[in-house]
Regions:
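Right-handed parallel beta-helix
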Residues: 460-465, 499-511, 533-547, 557-572, ...
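Right-handed parallel beta-helix/beta-spiral solenoid domain characteristic of secreted/periplasmic
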Residues: 422-488, 510-511, 515, 520
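Surface beta-loop-beta hairpin patches that serve as ligand-binding interfaces in beta-rich domains
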Residues: 339-362, 643-735
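C-terminal, active-site-flanking charged/polar segments
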Residues: 128, 324, 328-329, 336-354, ...
Length: 735
């Protein structure tokens, strides 16, 4: 009970009447007292909740753990400051609440295989499958005690078994490997007394009811699941396990869908007919729908979906009323004489490392208190962005702040020019758990077709949760028109945008991705800033190159702030940040926990921390700013550096081994191509100076806040604690 008048209402009515006649001084006094009473009661209630691990505050978890003998893993790193958001997030990884809550139960189940899977999930947050490798050894059967399911030889006719070779689900016998699985050098797997914990670090994200992309270059019957038109492997929507003792199988883990399991093997098809899709995957992880003239979807039944290898688009042609699907590449082929007339909608799961770049995940939404929200979608009165902009323009009285919110994961193809009046605020954002795509087409032959934004004094523009492909985003000062040449800068003034925020968005590097994963326009920037002083903020986003053009270098440089993002210029030799002419950008850069692929040429770096620069960095003003706990390639010209690589290894290496050490600590990624699941993920062979080189011993780069080194160290320590005596247990990264 937190009512402000709780004490005043306890007074007899006669005193309240007298108090009202005198203007309510007694009521005001009791409201002040009630406020303090409420604070004390809430504190008492919070103290009671702190007695239980399920309801206690995060700072109480270590104390409850100490009461039951829980010991933190010091190899994972020291706890952070709980008063700061970064330290608070780190402490939740170092001392997981779920592990503390279940530690007594773990001790009772010590030595069981299923416990190792629970440990992986509760300690590190990674789904896992535990495997005992001695069961997969090939050996001679004893005549007295034959075990027909063990010790077999490899069956080269078993295509399904060979398809699983090397994975966590293989049943193919192996010869013995004498190397230990937890060796610090080269690891082995198949040995007596060896168990492995296969962990899946990539998270799966859903895409619901989005249009498939028609690849007209290959044929009007060829489609991709990805709305941008490139290959995307489909992933399993992991099903919960049925019991605590159950060992996870392929349906319980966020693993990529392979072609063989995607086919239904429970029922034999008629002679000469292919197998249709399995109920384990279709409808649950994947679905395809055809739309009618009115846009109403009709789902294709799984009996009409044929799993196929479509690495060659024209290799397989489905029969009439059927559709071929390749889950490995994310491709769809319809019969050539039965093409979709009104569109195709698909739902599927894809994988990525973290919640960045937009998608169907929860994120924090914000807007001004006075903002008016215009909802756009195929089922809404406003169908397009232009309809929403016109509704805002014609609104009487016109709101100073507007939010255009996309209510579905539709693809919007519009030509947009936004011009904000003084003090106006406009936000284009996706609704929660939606993934809209804005595809900018080549409408005009004589002019560029980027998403163009101008604004006057005090105006603000925000993008949140969108994927933009086909063209880039151009922010331009109000003093020049979009038709003007960049060779004729106007006089700087205050008549300009105040700030631009790009949050949880993807501005596709190279504008769009071809079917083979290569960018279509690798030399074109995703973000152009022409003659504007707007403060640009980029948060949890993926962008291509950034180009700027300044009015007059006698004024202050344009501020750009980048956090938890990827800036991808396609290769380390191209410019990730530079002027439109390829010279030094007149920019004051602040960057944290980000990965930059490409060269950076900027006027100043005020602060760069926990960041990977994959290309040479050139800063004009070296006497101002700092670069700390980052990777900066040799040959870079930066402000003073602190605890950066390869500077640290050069200081400690022998003179003859300097170059060897410099090459050793160079960041290695699993993939640097946008659209792949392991995009910008540090590889297992990457040097520890990079994977634990941040200021809190986490990894450098965009995935710093995942705290993967701390998760892995915690899990290794718990494996040593709960593995049966005489056995070796190790971690194997499945992706």
């Amino acid at each position: 009970m937190n009512k402000a008048d709780r004490l005043y209402e306890l007074l007899p009515a006669v005193y309240r009447m007298v108090d009202e006649e005198q203007g309510g001084p007694l009521r005001g006094l009791l409201q002040v007292i009630s406020e303090q009473v409420n604070i004390i009661e809430n504190d008492i209630s919070r103290l009671y909740d702190n007695w239980f691990i399920e309801t206690c505050d995060d700072w109480v978890v270590p104390y409850i753990g100490e009461l039951i003998g829980y010991e933190p893993v010091h190899e994972a790193g020291e706890p952070g400051d709980p008063q700061q958001s970064e330290g608070h997030a780190l402490n939740k990884i170092l001392i997981p609440r779920r592990e503390v809550a279940n530690v007594i139960g773990y001790r009772r189940r010590k030595g069981t295989l299923a416990l190792l899977e629970l440990l992986a999930n509760n300690v590190s947050g990674w789904p896992a499958r535990a495997v005992e490798f001695y069961k997969l050894l090939g050996w001679t059967q004893p005549l007295n005690h034959p075990r027909l399911r063990r010790g077999q030889h490899s069956n080269l006719v078993d295509g399904a078994g060979l398809d699983l070779l090397g994975s966590a689900f293989t049943q193919t016998p192996h010869t013995i490997d004498v190397r230990r699985i937890n060796s610090q050098r080269t690891t082995g797997r198949y040995n007596i007394g060896t168990a492995a914990l296969f962990v899946w670090r990539l998270k799966t994200y859903s895409v619901t009811g989005t249009p498939a992309y028609c690849l007209e270059d290959e044929g009007p019957e060829c489609y991709t699941f990805n709305a941008l038109g490139h290959d995307t492997p489909l992933y399993t929507f992991a099903q919960p396990e049925t019991s605590p003792t159950h060992i996870a199988d392929q349906l319980n883990l966020p693993a990529p869908i392979r072609r063989r399991p995607f086919a239904d093997h429970t029922v034999e098809p008629p002679p000469g007919k292919p197998r249709h899709a399995s109920a384990d995957y279709y409808d649950g992880s994947v679905s395809i729908s055809l739309t009618d003239r009115d846009g109403k979807p009709t789902e294709i039944p799984r009996e009409n979906v044929i799993p196929a290898n479509l690495s060659n688009w024209h290799r397989y042609r489905p029969e009439r009323d059927h559709v071929a699907v390749d889950p490995v590449l994310g491709r769809i082929v319809f019969p050539s004489n039965q093409k979709p007339r009104h569109g195709v909608l698909v739902s599927y799961q894809y994988a990525f490392s973290a919640d960045i770049g937009g998608g169907e995940y929860e994120r924090q939404l914000s807007e001004p208190v006075s903002a008016h929200i215009f909802r756009v979608g195929r089922k809404e009165p406003l169908k397009t962005i232009k309809d929403a902009l016109d509704a805002w323009k014609n609104q009487k009285p016109k709101a100073r702040a507007a939010v255009i919110e996309f209510q579905d994961s539709e693809v919007y193809t519009e030509q947009l020019n936004v011009n904000l009046l003084p003090g106006e605020y406009l936000q284009l954002r996706a609704a929660q758990r939606k993934r809209p795509v804005l595809r900018l087409l080549d409408y005009l032959a004589s002019l560029p077709d980027a998403l163009r934004v101008q604004g006057q004094q005090g105006s603000r523009f925000v993008l949140d949760g969108l994927t933009i492909g086909g063209r880039g985003l151009k922010i331009k000062g109000q003093e020049t028109n979009f038709d003007d040449s960049i060779e004729m800068p106007a006089t700087p003034g205050d008549n300009d945008l105040c700030d631009v925020t790009i949050r949880h968005c993807t501005l596709v590097p190279g504008w769009s991705v071809q079917g083979d994963g290569e960018p279509q326009r690798p030399n074109d920037p995703s973000l152009e800033l022409e003659y504007t002083r707007a403060c640009v903020r980029i948060e949890h986003s993926i962008l291509g190159a950034i180009r700027t053009e300044a009015h007059d270098e006698a004024s202050e440089p344009q501020p750009i702030q980048i956090t938890d993002s990827i800036i991808d210029a396609i290769s380390e030799d191209r410019m990730a940040l530079a002027s439109l002419r390829g010279a030094i950008a007149y920019v004051a850069l602040n960057i944290a926990r980000s990965t930059v692929i490409g060269r950076v040429q900027t006027h100043a770096i005020e602060l760069a921390e926990n960041t990977i620069f994959n290309g040479i960095v050139t800063v004009a003003r070296r006497g101002h700013g700092c670069v700390r706990f980052s990777y900066v390639p040799e040959g870079s010209r930066t402000p003073r550096r602190y605890e950066c690589q390869p500077d640290l290894v050069k200081q400690t290496a022998d003179q003859d081994a300097v170059q060897v050490q410099v090459d050793r600590v160079r960041p290695v990624f699993n993939s640097v191509r946008y659209g792949t699941p392991s995009y910008c993920q540090l590889a297992d062979r990457c040097a520890q100076e990079i994977t634990r080189g941040a200021d809190d011993e986490s990894e450098m780069g965009v995935f710093h806040d995942l705290f993967q080194p701390q998760r892995a160290a915690n899990l290794r320590a718990r494996l040593d604690e709960y593995t049966p005596a005489g056995m070796d247990a190790g971690i194997v990264y499945a992706n």
